[in-house]
Each structure stands twice: as structure tokens, then as C-alpha cells.
């Protein structure tokens, strides 16, 4: 999902296509302004997801990225980062966008029986 221009074109052309955040925090956090605009524009098509396991520190980093304007923080708590030794910036999404990304979009995709 790090090529947001390409992903945006796919979302524009395929109305039933959704994206998640799995394994993209490192790239998205390097382009905070573009990422924030992308999330706001496509807020109904993005779902929260990670393939990093159940470690609390991983989730804290995702929340920090999505919910704050924190600058230049380490995205990876492991000794050897999975994607590079750089730092990222938070995008502080509006509350209504966070609600959709965290919960509402997935509820729409997987309605209760």
C-alpha cells in the first residue's frame, strides 16, 4: 500500500476493493501528509489489520501512528527492523475516520448473522 497513487487509482476503479494496513506502517509513516489525505479520502475503504502478532508494542505503534502527530519515532521495536532503519511520523486522523478504520468498515464487510 505504500504507492498511494496506484492504490488510489485501484480504489477509484474497483468500488468493492478494500485495503488494510498490514506490514505498511514503515512506508506510510515516511509520507505523513499524503497518507493522511489518502486515509481521509478513502476512509470507507480502509480496515485496520496487522500480521505482526499479538505483541502490545506493535499495536501501540499503530495507534501512535494513526492517532497522533508524533514526529520521528521508531516504528519497529525489534532488534533488526523488518523494513529499514528509519523513523516515521504520525498522521492524527479525525475521530470519525479512526472509527471507520478500526471498526465500522469491517463490520460492513462482515455483518453479523
Predicted segment positions?
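H/E-rich (His + Asp/Glu) clusters that bind or coordinate divalent metals
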Residues: 1-113
Amino acid at each position: 500500500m505504500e504507492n498511494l497513487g496506484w492504490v488510489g487509482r485501484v480504489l477509484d476503479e474497483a468500488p468493492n476493493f478494500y485495503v488494510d494496513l498490514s506490514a505498511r506502517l514503515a512506508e506510510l509513516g515516511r509520507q505523513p501528509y499524503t497518507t493522511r489525505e489518502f486515509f481521509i479520502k478513502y476512509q470507507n475503504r480502509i480496515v485496520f489489520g496487522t500480521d505482526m502478532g499479538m505483541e502490545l508494542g506493535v499495536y501501540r505503534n499503530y495507534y501512535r501512528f494513526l492517532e497522533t502527530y508524533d514526529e520521528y519515532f521508531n516504528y519497529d521495536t525489534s532488534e533488526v527492523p523488518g523494513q529499514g532503519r528509519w523513523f516515521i511520523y504520525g498522521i492524527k486522523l479525525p475521530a470519525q475516520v479512526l472509527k471507520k478504520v478500526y471498526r465500522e468498515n469491517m463490520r460492513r464487510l462482515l455483518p453479523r448473522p
